[in-house]
Amino acid sequence: PSTASPSIRSSRVPPAGPVANESTQLYYCGAGAQGIDLTLDFAAFASHMIQVMDGEGRLVYRAPINLNSGEKNAMTTEIRQLEPQPIWIHFADLNAVPRPSKKEARVIEFMKSFGEELGLETLVDDIGNVIIRKPATPGMEDRTPVVIQGHLDMVCQKNADTDFDFDNQGIEMYVDGDWVRARGTTLGADNGIGVAAAMAILASDDIAHPPIEALFTIDEETGMTGAMNLAGGVLQGGIMLNLDTEDDDEITIGCAGGVDVNISGRYEEAPVKPGSVAFTLTVKGLSGGHSGMDIHRGRGNANKLLARVLLTAVESHGIGIAAIDAGGLRNAIPREGSAVITVDASDVEAFKRFLAEQAAVLKTEYATTDPQLAVTLEAAELPAQVMDERFQGQLLRAVRACPHGIHRMSPDVDDLVQTSNNVARVLAREGEYQAQCLTRGSVDSEKMDLAEAIRATFELIGADVRLEGAYPGWAPRPDAPIVKLMGALYEELFGAEAPLMACHAGLECGILGSNYPEMQMISFGPNIRGAHSPDEKVQISSVQKFWGYLLETLQRIPPR
């Protein structure tokens, strides 16, 4: 069958779990076609895939499956029927495969099988990047080879009340008007939609294109180790189309670099004061978002707000702090943070009134950017020890003093954040503490200066501070032929001036460009909102616009 998702009727009910070396005969009748005998290989269930072969052993259908949830399958069917169908089918397939950053083994194998089953040259390098090459369509062999690039991993964030295992479950998606969302988790449209678009082109037999080299990198979200470890000389293309921009009204031609500021140390503990009771104090409900693309929106940082409340409570009520667990991923603005605290039993009611006042102040300050902000207090088991009084004040003051948000706007590019910092993680328990910041900047010297200032802040309290994982920015080349081509094409297709821009986020183009300095690069994509948070969503109509723009670009790539 030529359709990507044929209707299949089984002659008997599939088994409840994986069964090796067992198959059943199926009968498929396509529209206007004779029925053909097919074989369903249940051994493939071990990898949560369904494979349908024809009588000569040729693969005619392959897709992820979930044997345990008809509701989930129904939702996936709804996604697969969206237009442009080639993208949504592959996005549904991809989102059925767990792919957390640094745990990409299954999605690497999935992509490797995808390329090999298409009969395309497929490579997996030592770090796990997947490269799939497809020859040009007839008549376009002389065109400049194009690298289509995206990353396989996704940010894994979920709401506190969502029971979900990113290591073993596929994303549960649903349609909400003109948007596709996930249920209580990140969606993985960043960068799953870009990967799906590349897959659709590789799998097509009716899309005109030059020689294609699809590069699927790993670990973009937590270190860009895939891009950093891609060897020079591997790629053969002269133009790179990065599909990791999150706004269809932006064509990205430059980006910021970044550096991790990793902080750690030890502290003394002291016995809990007699007559104390324990609580878990939590700041939650913040909007979060991408620590680069959303840093200018002024949203609250749970780590900073928690430190603010705790320090005020230490000074006014003499609370003890047994543990802090706040924030998470380095590239996500923290949405939640909590601390286990001790309060004198005689002061509990006064402390609750104090906390209500603090919550009211924060809700007023962040009413527009974080309308769901909440400060809660729940009873907890009394710990045996708390932080030394002197140190807890030092740690909280250091977190409060550490800059978060915009450090400097670009004096040259309107509305571009030039340098920023995200206080991403604060963890303290049992005499040890850690913190992490991600400092971004399009001017490397200024970026490193801000990181050094953060280092100095925490070294004042005796912390060990390491600046690690620095990666370069991507300098704009507005006169590059691909920029001019896509700029003119944008105006032709959409009747508006091409929105060329640089972004305050770390795209892999900066790193890849350091090994391929002559390669022309550009980045674009559909509208994705709320990336790196459970509010992530991708706009259906925007995916249609993006797909048309991508296909028209491929048709117009000039001769090499």
Report each predicted region and the residues it spans:
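Acidic/His- and Gly-rich active-site-bordering loop/insert found
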Residues: 76-178
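His/Asp/Glu-rich mid-to-C-terminal helical/loop segments that flank catalytic regions of hydrolases
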Residues: 233, 299-316, 343, 347-348, ...
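Acidic-enriched catalytic cores of C-N bond-cleaving enzymes acting on peptides and small amides
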Residues: 254, 271-276, 295-325, 345-420, ...
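Fold-level recognition of mixed alpha/beta catalytic cores in primary-metabolism enzymes, strongest
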Residues: 212-302, 310, 314
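Zn-dependent metallopeptidase/amidohydrolase metal-coordination segment
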Residues: 84-87, 411, 418-431, 438, ...
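A short beta-alpha structural unit
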Residues: 92, 96, 340, 374-386, ...
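Low-acidity, Ser/Thr- and Arg-rich intrinsically disordered low-complexity segments
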Residues: 1-14, 23, 47
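Active-site metal-coordination/substrate-binding segment of hydrolases
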Residues: 140-222, 227-238, 275-278, 389-392, ...
